[in-house]
Amino acid sequence: ATAWSYGVDETMTFLIPNWEGGASGYNVGEKSQLCETMKDNGVPKRSAEQFCQQVPTYRGEKAFTSGPVYMGAIICFLFVLGLLIVPGPYKWALLVATLFSVALAWGRNMMWLTELFFNYFPMYNKFRAVESILVVAEITMPLLGILALQQIVDKKIAWEKLRMNMFIAGGITAGLCLFFALFASVVDVTSSYDAQWVNQVPAWLRDAIFDERTAMIKADAWRSFIFIALGFAVVYWYAWKSNTQPLASSPYRLIAFYGALAVLVLADMLPVNKRFFGNDHFVKAKDADAYFAMQPYEQQILQDESYYRVLNLATNTFNDARTSYRLKSIGGYSAAKLRRYQDLIDEHISKEMNPLMQTVMRTQGFMLPDENEGKDFPVLNMLNMKYAVVPLQGGKQAPVQNPYAMGNCWFVDEVILVDTPDEECALLSEIDLHKQAVADKKFAEALDITKPEVTPLMAFDESSIELTSYAPNCLQYESMNERNQVAVFSEIYYPYDWHLYIVNNNGEKMELPLARVNYTLRAAVIPAGHHQLVMEFQPHAIQTDKWCMAILILALLLSVGGLTYPLWRKKK
């Protein structure tokens, strides 16, 4: 959650948008100082212009970013003015809310406050990025600026005092901008993330990129200074006119005042917004449809009507969502990805992709069910990867069937208990996942391992368990086993609202406790016999919300009826 913490000095982007370098891959333009330097050093024009479309100008401490939080130069000026002239508790409430928002957005840079909110304030730990709390400041700062304008329009402050406070607010905001416009070189424009690329380019290009960062600060500092000066002039003009000529064309003056400010704010904000969310980010409907058009490899895979998963090696596996459009993907991207699944990607899946590709190349896409081959990517087999999509020449893709996929569920002979999650994760590449499972010792009771009355776990040729029906929120299985056995389900374990039942012929349900094995998967002890199993997702929060909504609607109807009935009786 703290990976996207807003830097303390990065807060200057409220006032100077490109203070921190804009975005991770920023388009500095063909007319930039960097582009000219590259051409002067013999780089072909086209290559220089292409490079300048994706320059590592961002110098903050986030892994990457698509743009800064820019409040607006005029908004910052009005906010500071509001702190000086707005009386009463509203000012202090808005100031405290703004400061809290900024402090929480700092995340790991103010860890004691972040940990306090993360651990003790409900729902706060659901935020993916702590900097998203800056939406509060994006409301409170303009709101205090509006209250400042109200003070000026309503003439609730003496002209001399107002003029002095206007110069103070303008001096603080415009003064900061002017200082960095004149002395931008005093800012350290290096970053700890520069090590990822700085040794891969010549020294002159490295220095040119650093100079471009400085130039970006200087240009935007001048820009903000000019907008503050213009905003100051408009506010000063209106306040001066209202005090020296209070009755002359007052309504038209007010319209001109608000109109001029609105135009200036839009002129300030819109160009900055378009830097990071411009016309290039919009896609035509026909282009979007073409992106999701059925591919030959998808047609081939979809002929298989069994239940399986696919790993797409022909794309950016863990940052691509297209594969999941038609296929059940092991990869893909989600902002709400479970941490344990990300661990599985980092520690196993990403490391098994290269051996998988080597096996595909060695077998020329025809993998035979040889036990020794499948041992190179056991976790992918555990996740029921029946197909791998591999790249071909000419930008095409082809599916390769994996005969080592372990299926949707299976019985194991032994469950190994460990003390820590690290041990559990590490053992996945060491044990035989077909016959063994590894679990945290806190699940020992749920797996019935510690209960002496349970028959020792053994595997029989007669034992079988298979998935018979699939839906995202309901999976049905059929099991046949002569003794109590641990079944491992190739489904990601989630501790809330998932329930496993044995369904008898008369429809009665008996719940079985679910446990976590193999770091991420679900497991349960299946009693001896022939059973129909149902695994259902039953979110209690949604059910509770439905009842609450029904009660509220009923209460609303009764209230409306109680209010209208006397009127109806009186009219009758």
Segment roles from a protein language model:
Residues 7, 19-24, 261-292, 296-380, ...:
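Extracytoplasmic/lumenal acceptor-recognition loop(s) of multi-pass membrane glycoenzymes
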Residues 77, 331, 386, 395, ...:
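Active-site-proximal, structured, solvent-exposed surfaces of multi-pass membrane proteins
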